[in-house]
């Protein structure tokens, strides 16, 4: 017992995070989630200090750091760090590394969920600029695939040729976030681009490999570089800075809603198993409300005079 007490007094934040990353709980997460968790833990360590003794981190200290993250990096990032670190401390309590979770009781700020979508013209402007420059071509492919197939940027970044059947013109994908499997047809224009991309870059495994200094690398873009290049293309296209690449999935789903596509059919594309999970991607638009009113009128409701 005395040894355990001494151990708890000297264990550092870095040690706590490393122990969690070696755990079965962490190993069972999807690769994408593990990468995200590692990023948020790294952010916390960089701020609090790798060698900081865990016993010195109390709730007021955690609250101060949370407030700083919210101010400097934004509320969504602060909430991600808080959530992951709370998991780390809960795991450490379970294995006896510490007695407390300083992140469990801090006041969490709420943030407005993004509802922004791109117009078809804005998507077209972005792609036209991206495909004019060889250095931006793969980013253009990633964005076009995300828009056409309604998938997450992370999955499109790491998409391999083995995922696409040129004969059937079908994408077969196991999503990294929830392991959902989807099979999606493609459009003629995207298929033609994929054929051209394979002719030029099929010697390596990725559909949209990283292009650096005019050379094709046999690796995908990372999340940060994709965002940086995406902003460069957006600026070159003269598009508003409120638009983000991650909004492509929401844009695709919103277009399906506007077109009157049923929820089960949307879920077959998005890979969601729960209808509630689709709601954050859905947006109230004049097109969808007009269609709802039209259907109501056709059914004999609404217009009574």
Task: Tell where the protein language model's regions lie, with residue ranges.
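Basic, Lys/Arg- and aromatic-enriched nucleic-acid-binding interface segment
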Residues: 79, 94, 98, 104-153, ...
């Amino acid at each position: 017992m005395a040894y355990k007490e001494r151990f708890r007094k000297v264990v550092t934040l870095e040690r706590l995070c490393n122990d969690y990353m070696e755990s079965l709980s962490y190993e069972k997460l999807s690769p994408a989630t593990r990468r995200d968790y590692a990023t948020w833990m790294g952010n916390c360590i960089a701020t609090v200090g790798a060698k900081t003794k865990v016993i010195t981190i109390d709730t007021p200290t955690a609250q101060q750091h949370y407030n700083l993250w919210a101010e400097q990096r934004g509320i969504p990032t602060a909430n991600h760090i808080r959530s992951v670190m709370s998991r780390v401390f809960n795991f450490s309590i379970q294995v006896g590394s510490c007695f407390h979770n300083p992140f469990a009781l801090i006041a969490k700020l709420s943030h407005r969920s993004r509802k922004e979508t791109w117009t078809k013209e804005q998507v077209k402007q972005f792609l036209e600029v991206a495909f004019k420059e060889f250095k931006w071509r793969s980013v253009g492919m990633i964005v076009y695939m995300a828009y056409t197939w309604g998938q997450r940027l992370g999955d499109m970044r790491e998409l391999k040729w083995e995922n696409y059947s040129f004969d059937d013109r079908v994408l077969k994908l196991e999503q990294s976030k929830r392991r959902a499997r989807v099979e999606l047809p493609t459009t003629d224009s995207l298929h033609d681009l994929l054929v051209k991309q394979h002719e030029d870059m099929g010697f390596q495994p990725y559909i949209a490999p990283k292009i650096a200094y005019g050379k094709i690398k046999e690796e995908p873009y990372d999340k940060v570089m994709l965002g940086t290049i995406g902003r460069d293309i957006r600026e070159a296209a003269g598009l508003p800075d409120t638009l983000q690449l991650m909004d492509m999935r929401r844009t695709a789903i919103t277009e399906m809603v506007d077109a009157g596509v049923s929820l089960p059919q949307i879920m077959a594309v998005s890979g969601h198993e729960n209808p509630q999970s689709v709601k954050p991607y859905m947006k109230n638009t004049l097109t969808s409300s007009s269609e709802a009113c039209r259907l109501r009128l056709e059914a004999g409701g609404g217009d009574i005079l």
